[in-house]
């Protein structure tokens, strides 16, 4: 192989290897769940579900640290949420990590009125009060 072919091959390998984004690290780190419970399907639960979806969809595109609130309708309490991703991961990996943490937050904390779950590359929190 000529020296120019070797150089071209090396450049292609570097571009391909450098361009391949590593998946988000979704290893469980910690969780904290409020002992007070809410009813699934209640107005607050629906606000909470909307807040979590908002966090999942938008955190990667709003500085990797995003807070939201979903105002209760008909007197239901407002749901407050926050999500954070490590700055070192891609936007798609941030969204993927938050999808993972959103599933886990329900699995770990069930119907808790407030919860926090930390994975290696992302974090999510929700409460019935502002923070």
Curated annotation (Swiss-Prot):
Keyword Nucleus: no
GO molecular-function term, one example from the UniProt record: D-mannose binding
Keywords: Antibiotic, Antimicrobial, Disulfide bond, Fungicide, Lectin, Mannose-binding, Plant defense, Signal
Disulfides per UniProt: 33-109, 85-94, 97-122
Any one Gene Ontology BP term: defense response to bacterium
Gene3D superfamilies: Gnk2 domain, C-X8-C-X2-C motif
The keyword tRNA processing appears for this protein: no
The Gnk2-homologous domain, residue ranges: 26-131
The protein's role, per its UniProt record: Exerts antifungal activity through its carbohydrate-binding specificity.
Protein name: Antifungal protein ginkbilobin-like protein 2
Upper lineage: Eukaryota, Viridiplantae, Streptophyta, Embryophyta, Tracheophyta
């Amino acid at each position: 192989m000529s020296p120019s072919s070797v150089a071209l091959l090396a450049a292609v390998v570097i571009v391909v290897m450098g361009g391949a984004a590593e998946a988000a690290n979704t290893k469980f780190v910690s969780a904290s769940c409020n002992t007070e419970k809410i009813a699934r399907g209640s107005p607050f639960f629906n606000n909470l579900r909307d807040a979590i979806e908002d966090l999942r969809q938008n955190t990667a595109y709003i500085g990797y640290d995003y807070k939201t609130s979903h105002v209760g309708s008909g007197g239901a309490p407002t749901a407050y949420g926050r999500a954070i991703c490590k700055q070192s991961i891609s936007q798609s990996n941030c969204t993927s990590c938050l999808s993972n943490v959103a599933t886990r937050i329900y699995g770990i904390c069930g119907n808790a009125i407030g919860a926090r779950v930390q994975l290696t590359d992302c974090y999510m929190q929700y409460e019935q009060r502002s923070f």
